[in-house]
C-alpha cells in the first residue's frame, strides 16, 4: 500500500496542477473518482491488463463521457507507464490536495438514527466554526451507537455516542 501511494503521489500532484491551471478542479475530481471505480472493477482490471489493449483504448475505457481532453491524455500517460493499478490511490491523493487547496474538510457523521436536516445543519455550522473552513459531509447510521453521533474528519474524531460513554463508564467502574 505504501508503495502504491508513493507511485501515485506524482500523478496526483500532476493531475491537480493541470486541473487547477484549467480551472477544472471539481470536474477532474469527479472524473478521477469515476475512472478509479471503473479500474477497480475486477472484470475491467482484467481487460486493462490485456496485452492487445493500447494506452489510448485504456484511457477511452476509463474516461467519463465528455471528459476534458487533457484528462484523457493524463489517463493515456498513466496507462503508457503501466500504472493504472494505482488509479484509486491517485484519486484519493487528488482529493486530499483539492480539499487542502480549497480549505475543505470532509466529515463523516455517523449517528444512531437518521439526523433531521436542522440537526445536520447545526452540526455542520459548528464544524465550520471550529475548523474555520468549508465542510463536506457524508452521513451514516449505526444503531449500535444507541444514541448521539460520531464525527470523523480524518484528523479529529468527536465521539458523542452513548455507546462510548457507557464504555468509558464501564472502564472507570472496573478499575
Curated annotation (Swiss-Prot):
Any GO CC annotation of this UniProt entry: plasma membrane
GO molecular function, a single term: proton-transporting ATP synthase activity, rotational mechanism
Pfam families per UniProt: OSCP
Membrane topology recorded in Swiss-Prot or TrEMBL: Peripheral membrane protein
Keywords of the record: ATP synthesis, Cell inner membrane, Cell membrane, CF(1), Hydrogen ion transport, Ion transport, Membrane, Transport
Subcellular location: Cell inner membrane
Highest taxon of the lineage: Bacteria
Primary role: F(1)F(0) ATP synthase produces ATP from ADP in the presence of a proton or sodium gradient. F-type ATPases consist of two structural domains, F(1) containing the extramembraneous catalytic core and F(0) containing the membrane proton channel, linked together by a central stalk and a peripheral stalk. During catalysis, ATP synthesis in the catalytic domain of F(1) is coupled via a rotary mechanism of the central stalk subunits to proton translocation.
Quaternary structure and partners: F-type ATPases have 2 components, F(1) - the catalytic core - and F(0) - the membrane proton channel. F(1) has five subunits: alpha(3), beta(3), gamma(1), delta(1), epsilon(1). F(0) has three main subunits: a(1), b(2) and c(10-14). The alpha and beta chains form an alternating ring which encloses part of the gamma chain. F(1) is attached to F(0) by a central stalk formed by the gamma and epsilon chains, while a peripheral stalk is formed by the delta and b chains.
HAMAP family the record matches: ATP_synth_delta_bact (MF_01416)
UniProt record similarity statement: Belongs to the ATPase delta chain family.
Name of this protein: ATP synthase subunit delta
Organism of this sequence: Xylella fastidiosa (strain Temecula1 / ATCC 700964)
Gene behind this protein: atpH
Amino acid at each position: 500500500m505504501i508503495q502504491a501511494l508513493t507511485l501515485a503521489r506524482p500523478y496526483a500532484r500532476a493531475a491537480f496542477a493541470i486541473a487547477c491551471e484549467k480551472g477544472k478542479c471539481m470536474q477532474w475530481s469527479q472524473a478521477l473518482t469515476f475512472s478509479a471505480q471503473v479500474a477497480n472493477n475486477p472484470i475491467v482490471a482484467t481487460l486493462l491488463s490485456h496485452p492487445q489493449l493500447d494506452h489510448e483504448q485504456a484511457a477511452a475505457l476509463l474516461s467519463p463521457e465528455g471528459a476534458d481532453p487533457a484528462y484523457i491524455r493524463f489517463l493515456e500517460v498513466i496507462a503508457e507507464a503501466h500504472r493504472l493499478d494505482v488509479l484509486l490511490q491517485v484519486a484519493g491523493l487528488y482529493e486530499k490536495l483539492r480539499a487542502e487547496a480549497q480549505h475543505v474538510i470532509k466529515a463523516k457523521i455517523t449517528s444512531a438514527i437518521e439526523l433531521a436536516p436542522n440537526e445536520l445543519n447545526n452540526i455542520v455550522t459548528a464544524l465550520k466554526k471550529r475548523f474555520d473552513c468549508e465542510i463536506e459531509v457524508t452521513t451514516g447510521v449505526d444503531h449500535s451507537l444507541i444514541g448521539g453521533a460520531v464525527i470523523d474528519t480524518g484528523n479529529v474524531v468527536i465521539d458523542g455516542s452513548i455507546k462510548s460513554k457507557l464504555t468509558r463508564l464501564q472502564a472507570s467502574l472496573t478499575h
